């Protein structure tokens, strides 16, 4: 059955879309990777081109990850995922797509499937310096680089950095930039990570989807957003536990959120709410005071939480809070 599906797909794709793909010169560096412990798949990329995240990275939970760049043929992304989802390895899928592409010489593409099979292609007419390095559970690729050492620097950084998939891919991007990066400069970046426990529902499977569309230092900004993303992951868990009245768990999550993003007063605010619900008023009051000084509207909002059951205190305690 899979053979029939793939055959039909190839006929439909290459007879209908081969001539209408939108080729765009996304000279860049990127990484595709699999975390074999968690099953997470990801792509991270930077380019001196607007909105690189809308074209280069393609990831599907439980299937694979693809980066399509140089003179981009976007079709490699969705078409490659379909082929891998229907049982092809990354190598087989990339081979088929390249064979059907008359302009493969200007393409740079990397694919990894859920089993860790990796394939990469750097066309002979990609602009120097252009190359790729394939390693266990990853591929790094770059074109139009200032120095030929960029891919190897990315590979070493990914292999040697200790952390989760986002940390390791971020290390690879930073290593590329430290080697000179894109010879034209820097403009946009993106990171996409999909869950290792696929549900088949895209929004549920998306662990991270961050895009820097246009920025003088997109790598630095992407790293900042990753930190904020982690903060809100903990904040969202805190909200969940607060709804369930699991106050100890909520306090733990809000504390972590505040540590990741201390410059946002709303995150410690919810920590103070959780502490008040635990009747730890002396711990909550100084946090409320600091938060209210930074954002007076949070003070106005506080009494409204009682009506919805998010703040479980009596009027006496509320008055103490409102006096801060």
What does each of the following model-derived ranges do?
Residues 236, 270, 304-305:
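Canonical tetratricopeptide repeat
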Residues 262, 296-297:
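Short coil turns that delineate tetratricopeptide repeat
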Residues 243, 277-278, 311:
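Register position in tetratricopeptide repeats
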Residues 18-184, 191, 213-244, 259:
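Alpha/propeptide regions of enzymes that mature by internal proteolysis
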């Amino acid at each position: 059955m899979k053979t029939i599906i793939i055959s039909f797909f190839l006929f439909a794709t290459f007879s209908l879309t081969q001539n209408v793909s939108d080729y765009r010169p996304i000279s860049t560096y990127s990484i595709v990777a699999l975390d074999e412990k968690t099953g997470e798949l990801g792509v991270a990329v930077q380019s001196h081109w607007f909105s690189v995240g809308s074209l280069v990275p393609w990831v599907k939970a439980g299937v694979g990850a693809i980066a399509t760049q140089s003179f981009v043929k976007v079709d490699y992304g969705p078409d490659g995922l379909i082929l891998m989802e229907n049982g092809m390895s990354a190598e087989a899928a990339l081979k088929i797509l390249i064979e059907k592409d008359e302009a493969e010489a200007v393409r740079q593409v990397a694919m990894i499937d859920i089993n860790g099979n990796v394939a990469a292609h750097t066309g002979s007419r990609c602009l120097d310096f252009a190359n790729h390095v394939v390693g266990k559970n990853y591929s790094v690729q770059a074109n139009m680089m200032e120095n030929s050492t960029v891919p190897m620097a990315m590979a070493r950084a990914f292999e040697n950095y200790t952390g989760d998939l986002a940390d390791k891919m971020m290390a690879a991007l930073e290593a590329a930039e430290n080697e000179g990066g894109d010879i034209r400069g820097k403009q946009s970046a993106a990171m996409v990570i999909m869950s290792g426990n696929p549900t088949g529902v895209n929004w549920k499977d998306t662990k991270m989807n961050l895009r820097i569309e246009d920025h003088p230092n997109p790598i630095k900004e992407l790293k900042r957003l990753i930190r904020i993303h982690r903060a809100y992951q903990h904040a969202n868990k805190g909200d969940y536990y607060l709804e369930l009245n699991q106050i100890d768990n909520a306090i733990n999550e809000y504390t972590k959120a505040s540590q990741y993003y201390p410059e946002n007063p709303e995150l410690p605010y919810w920590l103070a709410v959780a502490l008040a619900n635990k009747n730890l008023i002396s711990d909550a009051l100084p946090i409320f005071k600091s938060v209210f000084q930074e954002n007076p509207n949070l003070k106005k909002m506080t009494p409204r939480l009682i009506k919805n059951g998010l703040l479980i205190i009596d009027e006496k305690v509320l008055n103490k809070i409102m006096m801060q």
